[in-house]
C-alpha cells in the first residue's frame, strides 16, 4: 500500500464506487497482464493497473477486484458483517504465497495480506475466481465488467458469468470519473512528482553539450528520477534537431550539435502518479534569432492559456486563447496563417493538453452530456436529452498545457529561417479556487534558459564536468 495514501482514503474510494453501482450489481476489475520483453520469461518491469492502484494501492500482477452489491438492499458498509444485514462486499483474488516463486520475484501479499493490508472483506486465491464468481453471478441483477484487459483473466470471468455475458457495463468508466478530481493526498504526490521531474530537466539542461548523444541526456533524466524514488512515467523523449518533428521520438544515438535545439519530453512517476514536462533549448546554450523569435511565440501562447485557468473554464476556451496567440505571433514573423496558407494543424498537429494523474494521459471525459430545456426539446421534464459540451474545470483537476510548433524542412510556405525548428513547452497545472497552480518549474523563458546554461558552462570550465553532478536528491 502506498505510504502517501491512507487505508481510510482507499476505503473511501471503494465506497464511492459502491455508491455509484445499483443494488444487486456485481463489478469485476482485472489486473493488466505481465508483458514479455523477449524470450520466454524475460518480462518488462510490471506496473499495476491504475484503477487497481487507485482503489487499493495493490501492485502485484494476476489479481482481480470484485465489488459485490448483490445483497437485498445494497446499502450497508463494506465493513459490516453483522448477521442478517445486507452487505456490500469487497473481494480480492490474488496470487497465493509460493516459496518457489517468491524466491525469484519477491514476497506476495497472499490471501491474508489482501484482507489485512488492502481492505478486502474476503480474499481468495486467483485460481478460485471462476468458482466464486459463478456463485455470485447467479444473484446479480447487473454485471459490470470490461473485457480486453487481460486475456487469461477474461477467460475465467467469461466462463463464470455464463449466460450473463451479454449486456455488461463498464465499471472503469465510473472509476475514471472518480479519478478526475484529485484529493489533497493525490495533489501532494503530484506536486512532488512535478518537483522531481523539474529537477531532472534542469540536470539534463546542465549536461547538454555538443557531441553528446540523446541517450546521454535520457540517462541523466532517469538517474534523477531514480535518486528521488521514482521512475520514468513514460518513454523519455530526447529529440535533437529535426528529430523533434516526430512528436513521440524516442531518445536515440543522434548527436547533439551546436546550432540545433533539443526537445525533451520527460516526466517522473512517484507512487504511481505522473509528471509530464517538456522543454526545448539550444544545444549551445544560446538561441539564434529565429529560434528565439519562434520560442517566444510558443511561450506566450502557453502563458496566456495558463493564466486563464480557473474553475468553470473549458478546454475549448483555452484552445481558442492559445490559437489566437500562436496565429498572431506566427503572422508577425511572416507565416501565412489562415485561409489559403498554413492551418494550425500544419504547425501544431496535437491538442493543447490532457488530464494528468495515475496515467500520463489520464482518464475522465473531456466532454460531458448537457441537458437542454424541455420546452426546446419538446420532451417532458425528467426525460431530457442533451448534447456533449466541453466540461468545465473543477478545483482539484490536474492537466497539462503543451503548445508547440513543428516546422517542416521542405514546406516552402514556412519562412526559410524557421524551417526545421521544433518547439514544445509543457507544464503541469493544478486547478485551484484561485486559478492555476503550476506544479513544474524548470527554466522556461529565454533569459532563464540562457542564464542557467551559462552557469553550467562556467562550472564545467572551472571545475570539470563532474562538478555539475546528477546526484540531486530532494528533501522529503
What residue spans do the PLM features occupy?
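Active-site neighborhoods and metal-handling regions in enzymes and metal-associated proteins
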Residues: 1-476
Amino acid at each position: 500500500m502506498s505510504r502517501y495514501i491512507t487505508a481510510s482514503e482507499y476505503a473511501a474510494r471503494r465506497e464511492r464506487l459502491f455508491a455509484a453501482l445499483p443494488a444487486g450489481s456485481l463489478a469485476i476489475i482485472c489486473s493488466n497482464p505481465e508483458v514479455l520483453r523477449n524470450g520466454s520469461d524475460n518480462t518488462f518491469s510490471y506496473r499495476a493497473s491504475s484503477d487497481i492502484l487507485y482503489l487499493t494501492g495493490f501492485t502485484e500482477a494476476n489479481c482481480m477486484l470484485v465489488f459485490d452489491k448483490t445483497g437485498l438492499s445494497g446499502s450497508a458498509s463494506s465493513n459490516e458483517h453483522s448477521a442478517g444485514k445486507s452487505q456490500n462486499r469487497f473481494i480480492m483474488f490474488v496470487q497465493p504465497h509460493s516459496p518457489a516463486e517468491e524466491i525469484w520475484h519477491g514476497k506476495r501479499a497472499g490471501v491474508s495480506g489482501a484482507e489485512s493490508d488492502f481492505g478486502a472483506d474476503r480474499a481468495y486465491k486467483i485460481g478460485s475466481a471462476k468458482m466464486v464468481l459463478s456463485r455470485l453471478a447467479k444473484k446479480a441483477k447487473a454485471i459490470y465488467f470490461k473485457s480486453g484487459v487481460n486475456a487469461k483473466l477474461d477467460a475465467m470471468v467469461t466462463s463464470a458469468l455464463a449466460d450473463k455475458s451479454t449486456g455488461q457495463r463498464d465499471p472503469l468508466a465510473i472509476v475514471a470519473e472518480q479519478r478526475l478530481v484529485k484529493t489533497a493526498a493525490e495533489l501532494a504526490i503530484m506536486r512532488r512528482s512535478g518537483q522531481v521531474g523539474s529537477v531532472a530537466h534542469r540536470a539534463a539542461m546542465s549536461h547538454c553539450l555538443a557531441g553528446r548523444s540523446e541517450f546521454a541526456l535520457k540517462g541523466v533524466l532517469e538517474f534523477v528520477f531514480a535518486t528521488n524514488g521514482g521512475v520514468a512515467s513514460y518513454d523519455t523523449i530526447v529529440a535533437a534537431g529535426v528529430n523533434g518533428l516526430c512528436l513521440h521520438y524516442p531518445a536515440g544515438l543522434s548527436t547533439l550539435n551546436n546550432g540545433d535545439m533539443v526537445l525533451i519530453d520527460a516526466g517522473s512517476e512517484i507512487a504511481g502518479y505522473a509528471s509530464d514536462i517538456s522543454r526545448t533549448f539550444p544545444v549551445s546554450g544560446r538561441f539564434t534569432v529565429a529560434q528565439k523569435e519562434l520560442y517566444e511565440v510558443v511561450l506566450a501562447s502557453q502563458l496566456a492559456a495558463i493564466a486563464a485557468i480557473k474553475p468553470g473554464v473549458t478546454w475549448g476556451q483555452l484552445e481558442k486563447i492559445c490559437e489566437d496567440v500562436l496565429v498572431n505571433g506566427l503572422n508577425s514573423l511572416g507565416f501565412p496563417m489562415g485561409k489559403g496558407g498554413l492551418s494550425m494543424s500544419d504547425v501544431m498537429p496535437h491538442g493543447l493538453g490532457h488530464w494528468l494523474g495515475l496515467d500520463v494521459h489520464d482518464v475522465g471525459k473531456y466532454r460531458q452530456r448537457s441537458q437542454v430545456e424541455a420546452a426546446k426539446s419538446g420532451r417532458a421534464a425528467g426525460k431530457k436529452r442533451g448534447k456533449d459540451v466541453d466540461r468545465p474545470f473543477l478545483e482539484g483537476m490536474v492537466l497539462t498545457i503543451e503548445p508547440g510548433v513543428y516546422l517542416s524542412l521542405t514546406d516552402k510556405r514556412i519562412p526559410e529561417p524557421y524551417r526545421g525548428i521544433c518547439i514544445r513547452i509543457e507544464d503541469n497545472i493544478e486547478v485551484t479556487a484561485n486559478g492555476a497552480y503550476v506544479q513544474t518549474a524548470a527554466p522556461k523563458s529565454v533569459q532563464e534558459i540562457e542564464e542557467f546554461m551559462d552557469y553550467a558552462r562556467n562550472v564545467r570550465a572551472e571545475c570539470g564536468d563532474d562538478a555539475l553532478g546528477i546526484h540531486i536528491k530532494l528533501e522529503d
